[in-house]
């Protein structure tokens, strides 16, 4: 029988202890597709970068944090996005603009961004109507305390309501920001959105 060489075993264990975690970290970095910086975002997509909103862990996701006269960094971030949207519009339409806030995943901050960007625009004396097109959950309507009003987008798209002005409600405490709720949740949301009445 041959006794194990303790120095050789210790060196192999040390190398394995260094190499295996390093290999694991390298593989995870290759498989990680998330974006962490503005530079990574600009390199990954060919669209204009409007701004970034800091993560506010102590704020409730559905709170409107943009307030008149506030100098908080999150309020300033929304004002920068608002101003950049305005600068992108070189034609300066007088009719109106549409801004779509969307994402591939639920709970990614769409409601928070929509409400605060809308409030930022309203504070700049822009008439704002937020349209809740989530015909499956109506989360935007719920978050501002309006709830599921009997008349909303689904009622208009199904032809039960003809005058859009009947659907507009004041959003929260500020009368400059308005919302059209999703309305009663329909059994066929995809078909309603394709109905052509949204054009």
Identify the meaning behind each predicted range.
Residues 1-2:
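Polar/charged helix-initiation
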Residues 180:
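Conserved acidic segment of CheY-like receiver
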Residues 183:
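Active-site-proximal beta-strand/loop segments in catalytic clefts of secreted hydrolases
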Residues 11-129, 133-154, 158, 162-166, ...:
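Short boundary/hinge segments that flank catalytic cores
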């Amino acid at each position: 029988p041959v006794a194990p060489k303790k120095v050789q075993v210790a060196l192999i264990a040390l190398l394995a202890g260094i190499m295996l975690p390093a290999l694991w970290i390298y593989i995870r970095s290759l498989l990680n597709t998330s974006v962490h910086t503005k530079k990574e975002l600009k390199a990954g997509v060919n669209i204009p970068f409007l701004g970034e909103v800091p993560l506010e862990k102590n704020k409730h996701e559905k709170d409107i944090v943009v307030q008149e006269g506030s100098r908080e960094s999150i309020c300033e971030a929304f004002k920068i996005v608002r101003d950049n949207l305005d600068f992108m519009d070189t034609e300066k339409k007088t009719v109106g603009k549409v801004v779509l806030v969307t994402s591939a995943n639920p709970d990614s901050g769409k409601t928070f961004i929509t409400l605060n960007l809308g409030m930022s625009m309203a504070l700049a004396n822009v008439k704002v109507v937020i349209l809740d097109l989530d015909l499956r959950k109506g989360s935007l309507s719920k978050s501002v305390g309006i709830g599921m009003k009997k008349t909303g987008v689904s009622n208009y798209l199904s032809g039960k309501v003809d005058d859009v002005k009947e659907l507009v409600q004041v959003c929260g405490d500020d009368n400059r920001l308005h919302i059209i709720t999703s309305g009663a949740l329909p059994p066929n949301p995809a078909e309603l959105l394709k109905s052509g009445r949204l054009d």
